[in-house]
Amino acid sequence: MAEKNRLVTVAALQFACTDDVSTNVATAERLVRAAHQKGANIILIQELFEGYYFCQAQKEEFFHRAKPYPGHPTIVRMQNLAKELGVVIPVSFFEEANNAHYNSVAIIDADGTDLGLYRKSHIPDGPGYQEKYYFNPGDTGFKVFQTKYAKIGVAICWDQWFPEAARAMALQGAEVLFYPTAIGSEPQDDGLDSRDHWRRVMQGHAGANVVPLVASNRIGKEIIETEHGNSEITFYGYSFIAGPTGELVAAAGDKEEAVLVAQFDLDKIKSKRHGWGVYRDRRPDLYKVLLTLDGSNPVK
C-alpha cells in the first residue's frame, strides 16, 4: 500500500501589540489556539511580539526588555502550549547573552522541545528602525530545523529582503520558509509605502526556491517617546502565505487581526522542485562574487 503524502498546514498570525508583555503573550496564545482549531501544524507569531517595537528610538532603558534564552518565560509558556496542542511555534524574542544582545527566535517542536535558536543576521539601521543600537549581528548562520511536520527555515524581518538567506535555507533542505516581521510606515517619508514591495520580494523567494513561505507582521499605530519628540510607526500587517511558485494563497489586510491558514502537500512540492531543475542547474563555482561586498572578486 502506497504511503500517504506528507501534508502540512501552516498559519500566520497578525495582531496589534500593546506595551504590556502579559497582554501580548495572552493575545498570541489566543491566536495560536485559534490557528490550531483551524488545523494548523506550524504557527508563526510576528517579530518581537512581547511589546511595542522599541527600536523606533535609541533608549538605554529598553535594554531591560532583553532576557536570557535559557528559561525565558515566554519561550517556556509557548513550549507548554506547543506540547498541549501538538503544534510547532517559532518564538521571537529580545535575547540577552552576557554583554551581547540579539533579535532571536527559538523553534519549539510539537512536543514542546526547544529545537534551537536562530539570531537575526541582517540588522537594519534607519529612521524608525534603529536596530543596530540594540542588536549584535547574529552569529548562528542560516539554519534549518527538523520539526515533527516539516524541515523548516526561519529568518527574521530584514533578512527577508536578501535572496541569499532564503537560498541558504533551501539548500539545507528547508521545505517551508518562515519570516516573523515588524514593518510599517517610514517616519521620515509619509509617501513611502513598502508593503507591496515587501510582499513581492518574498513571493519571489518562494518561487525561486520552489518552497512555500509564511510571513507574519504586526498591525496598529505605535508611538515611542524620544528626546526629539515622538516617533510613530503604523504597522501595515499584510501577513501572507505564498505557495511554491510564489502564488499568494492566503493574505491579510492592513488593519484587522488575522489567522491565516494554508495546507501544502510537501511530497508533491518536492517532486515539482526536483523536476523544475533549479537545484540541478546551479553553478556554485560561478557565485564567488557573492562573497564580496562590492563585486570586486568575480570568477575568472
Swiss-Prot record:
**Hydrolase is among the record's keywords:** yes
Family of the protein in this entry: Belongs to the carbon-nitrogen hydrolase superfamily.
| Active site as annotated | 47, 120, 157
InterPro entries hit by this protein: Aliph_Amidase/BUP (IPR050345), C-N_Hydrolase (IPR003010), C-N_Hydrolase_sf (IPR036526), N-carbamoylputrescine_amidase (IPR017755)
Keyword Translocase in record: no
Q: What is this protein called?
A: N-carbamoylputrescine amidase
- Tell me what reaction this enzyme catalyses: N-carbamoylputrescine + H2O + 2 H(+) = putrescine + NH4(+) + CO2
> Which organism's genome codes for this protein?
Solanum lycopersicum
A Pfam family that this protein carries is CN_hydrolase
Instruction: List GO BP terms, alphabetically.
Output: putrescine biosynthetic process from arginine
